[in-house]
């Protein structure tokens, strides 16, 4: 179910504060966050945000096509290694 339009998109307050501070200084640095549920808003464009995937922080450069998506969509948590090969010896 999508979020109601009368509600604003969720962005963690600490993340929003860091981005606003960097925008006023016109600086670029990597912002580390654990907030995967935060929505990408236009003020984040051009920043690099390191999103936690459960094990490490993955740096993601934010572009205009990402606006409206959640940060967690760009940091996969599971690495699929493929199905087990057909080994007849292990079945016996």
Swiss-Prot record:
Major place of residence: plastid
Pfam families referenced in this protein's UniProt entry, alphabetically: Ribosomal_S19 (PF00203)
Keyword terms: Chloroplast, Plastid, Ribonucleoprotein, Ribosomal protein, RNA-binding, rRNA-binding
GO molecular function, one term: structural constituent of ribosome
Keyword Lipoprotein listed: no
Record carries keyword ATP-binding: no
Listed GO biological process terms: ribosomal small subunit assembly; translation
Assigned GO CC terms: chloroplast; mitochondrial small ribosomal subunit
Subcellular location: Plastid, Chloroplast
Protein purpose: Protein S19 forms a complex with S13 that binds strongly to the 16S ribosomal RNA.
Similarity annotation: Belongs to the universal ribosomal protein uS19 family.
Alphabetized PANTHER family for the sequence: RIBOSOMAL PROTEIN S19P FAMILY MEMBER, SMALL RIBOSOMAL SUBUNIT PROTEIN US19M
Protein name: Small ribosomal subunit protein uS19c
Encoding gene per record: rps19
């Amino acid at each position: 179910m999508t979020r109601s339009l009368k509600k604003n998109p969720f962005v963690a307050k600490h993340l929003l504060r860091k981005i606003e501070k960097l925008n006023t200084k016109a600086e670029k640095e990597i912002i580390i966050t654990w907030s995967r549920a935060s929505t990408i808003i236009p003020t984040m464009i051009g920043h690099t945000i390191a999103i936690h995937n459960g094990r490490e922080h993955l740096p993601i450069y934010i572009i205009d096509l990402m606006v409206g998506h959640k940060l967690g969509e760009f940091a996969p948590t599971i690495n699929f290694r493929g199905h087990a090969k057909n080994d007849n010896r292990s079945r016996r």
